[in-house]
């Protein structure tokens, strides 16, 4: 991919991520690499000067392999279900998984069903459950990321930390440890308008998370099969096409549309991943 083509790709990724669950108008079809090298290929700043930033809200563009880290109106704002990336991060830090492992399991009780009913009544993204259903960590993390299951976020909080408040405290501790100084989490799902961050903080978190094979595998799935809910689908725009390999979208009335997108490409023969984040769309 040449400079002009990659510049067009970058502009398209930013524009496409702003659509949030609509079609992504990428101008270049690329295949995801299997390995992202640690070496950095230098790229001129002109690469991103023509990027089409959104008309409102905020945005970030991060390409670790090229040393590109650009932002637009990088203000603190509610992030909706993008919050669940940190929910996954804390879970996988406290209860590490390898691909194919199930991790610890729990049995859904009446509280779990009532939580689902309450979330459904308030139009929060959630996954149907039933009393007696057995769900393991790998299923809960996958449901959290694929179908943005807010009730699974609550279950993970209980599984990992014993309670939602204790888990949220871990989220904020880890955010600070990662250098996310403009981020604060108020809940595990992002339904709270007090869960806030910047586009740049979330771009860097996404890049860190994509190094985890379980996370990367989960966010690449377009569907997931669960015992009671059956087959649920992803909300990530054009996942599996045009090089899109993840990661997470979200929307609330207060936050607007939010999207974190990862697109795999090549530049001068080197595999790269373009991370684009938009908030407040």
Show where each model-derived region lies:
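Active-site SXXK
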Residues: 78-106, 202
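Short, well-structured active-site flanking segments
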Residues: 93-112, 213-221
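Conserved catalytic neighborhood of penicillin-recognizing serine enzymes
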Residues: 113-153, 231-247, 251
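Penicillin-recognizing serine hydrolase domain
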Residues: 2-68, 163-281
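Short, solvent-exposed loop/turn elements at domain surfaces
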Residues: 68-71, 115-117
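Short glycine/serine- and small hydrophobic-enriched flexible loop segments
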Residues: 89-97, 158-161, 207-208
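A mature extracytoplasmic/lumenal domain signature
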Residues: 63-65, 83, 110-112, 131-133, ...
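Second-shell loop/turn segments in exported
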Residues: 70-78, 124-131, 139-143, 154-162, ...
